[in-house]
């Protein structure tokens, strides 16, 4: 009898353990299912060409995929399906812009992509998106459009990052894909020589073209990686812009998507890893800081100025609550009648569109050249005009006027006497008139001549860090904490 009771109890225990194990195995699946249900709010059809999956409890990142009905259509669909699930799991809202190629020109394609990015930014508050974290991605010809939008779109329609998969960059492959209609080749002074191998890459702009991740296959016989993706990476790296390059030994133009091979799996892992590790700088709550200036702001002579120039170091010093942007352009003057006026530059238009809360305006070094200073009667007027334009922005920024650092050598006819005795008094006068604060770099940087490059005009990376230190200390506490 005792043996029977023991057997019955053992069966009960085994049954209980079986149920327990089964329930434990179901819990993770149930939890994952609930997580997916919580993440996706709904699938939204925005118009006949645009639809998206909006993610609840998202960090605000969104990606727009550009898809076209050409010979790559099957590969595009496979790539989107492979990435869509992982994007949603990361809390990324995902949009797809579908369009036809027949009868279209590239201007129409880029315009529609720009309008889509602007739509997402305009709808950011109601769709719970971060307007400063909108990316664009494209495969093949879609990569061409994504790259062009990244390089040439106005600030409000330009993405914050791009994902380019075996992108068409060269004119040669554009012709092969029948897309060269209505395209004007870039001028001969572009970043790359104007042969057809570097067509889109020649439009890359220092500090202004957003960071990119390029995914290429070495055995792509449809789009030659050297003339296309590698050319774009070379232009980005040559301009000191942030860019990542992934090259797979095999996979073909479709990355093995059609065969479901190892390249496809590695590609998905690399895309997810890049997105997870991408540093987010700006949010709608960030204090936006615009650094406006010439080559000293730009970081001329400093390799990877996007990381080592003074604006980048200033970003690190100020911290996460700030979004510091470099709008420096080499050789530019404050004088509108100078040889290269800053106000004619895309960087000036971008700085205004950035709508900063704080501006560090540092111009005047190139104005001291005799060929420019002969127009000195316009310096005060032109500086007042710049300050007035900045202060009239919707954010009503606090404008700091930084004096030029000393010219330790008279390289390129730059005259430190003119800077100290003529330009700086005008800067101080304008500061009093417009209630701006002065950052006296000329005085405070004077002891650091050893932190200059051989030309005596441009700081080294260490000198740029010292500039950032001086500027950070001079930003008033109320401006830093507002």
Residue ranges and their predicted role:
Residues 161, 169-176, 191-230:
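The feature captures the conserved acid-bearing segment of alpha/beta-hydrolase catalytic domains
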